[in-house]
Amino acid sequence: MTERRHDREFVRTFFTSPTAVEGEDDSAKMLRRAAGLRGMQAPDVWVPDNEDATAPSMRDEGAENIVEVISEQGAEFPGEIHPRMVWHRDSPETRYQGFQHMLDITDPERGAVEHIHGFVIPEVGGIDDWKKADEFFTIVEHEHGLDEGSLAMSVIIESGEAELAMGDLRDEMGKPTNNLERLFLLVDGEVDYTKDMRAMTPTGELPAWPELRHNTSRGASAAGCVAVDGPYDDIRDVEGYRERMTDNQAKGMLGIWSLTPGQVVEANTSPLPPKTGSWLLDADGEEVELASEDGVEAYDGDRLSLEATDGGYELRVGGDARELTADELREELLGLTSYVPSMDDIVDSMEEFEAAKEAGRGAIAMTQSATLRIGGTEIDIEKDRMWDEATYQAAMTPISLFQDVYENRPDQHEELEERYGAGVVERAMEVGL
């Protein structure tokens, strides 16, 4: 696995705030509000946004607001702070403006830089453009006597050029001619990416761009960075936001842009293992979570029915009815069901495998069993899954994420212990070490 060089191995949330709001008595009010977020409402990475979220006429004032708010409140903020500057691969003037703002913000005498972990650079192009941005970071560090490479650089992937540049990172990082090892987050920007690709949809909505998200996750994994999905702008569509995160997580992209504190809460909790395990049933193409009732997993819908007969069982799925023996029914139901393990389940399995490995066994069988009730008919099912070292390492990802969160976000300890129980949290912090 490629080494990651930053304090955070995982980033769940990337939350942007305008740096200056025109027409307000206090133009920095959105920054002050964001700086006061705590617990699950506070993001892992807060991005005071001096680019798209702030009007061009307000950006000089926005840079001053960043200094003022972060110097006053940055020490207490529980996440990392990475302001977004202006930059564009085709505009030297824009790049220079962003550079000047970085110089002003990082002046040690102004008191903000000690709380700033890095900067976010949008609209990057090919790998040479990434190197230009990196050189500006190095100049800023030298100008203010900061350690070279101490400011992390995150980029927004908003063009085909930037997408292709991710394939060059492994060859370029670590060369003595650059400090690209400062790279931290690779963040998708699907709106500008859609414009750059000249893509269209009949409704005018953004394409889903699963290929971009896969490529960004792959590029981040290969380069030791962290992948983050772009903004989900239908802020009332909570279920759609959750589905997007679930799809991303299967690609290894565990972070997502958050536009509101409500989205931050959803994104902070989504990649964490569930509090309780649950059984899922494929009911004629619709995935349904079964209701757990006194140790029985029950389905009472109308897409699937089960009745006992003299010779066995009749299973009806949609309009298709089949006569099955008990063994045939169990085999069929094993193909229609799946189990979502809880945090406690994952920790139990990992502890069991660690004990077996210590006893000299390289692989063991883990059994999952349940009593299903479909309509009024019950039947027991069980299946074995072989665990070896590869299975163990794959299962470690959600635990590693939890450990990273618990170590870096003490402001969330109380909520995590309420969610799982102090005993499960303690055990989860010990497995895999």
From Swiss-Prot:
It is found in: Cytoplasm. Its EC number is 2.3.3.9. Transmembrane segments: none annotated. InterPro entries: Malate_Synthase-like_Aldolase (IPR053484), Pyrv/PenolPyrv_kinase-like_dom (IPR015813), Pyrv_kinase-like_dom_sf (IPR040442). The keyword Cytoplasm applies. Pathway: Carbohydrate metabolism; glyoxylate cycle; (S)-malate from isocitrate: step 2/2. GO terms for biological process: glyoxylate cycle; oxaloacetate metabolic process; tricarboxylic acid cycle. Homotrimer and homohexamer in equilibrium. This is Malate synthase. It comes from Haloferax volcanii (strain ATCC 29605 / DSM 3757 / JCM 8879 / NBRC 14742 / NCIMB 2012 / VKM B-1768 / DS2) (Halobacterium volcanii). The gene is aceB.
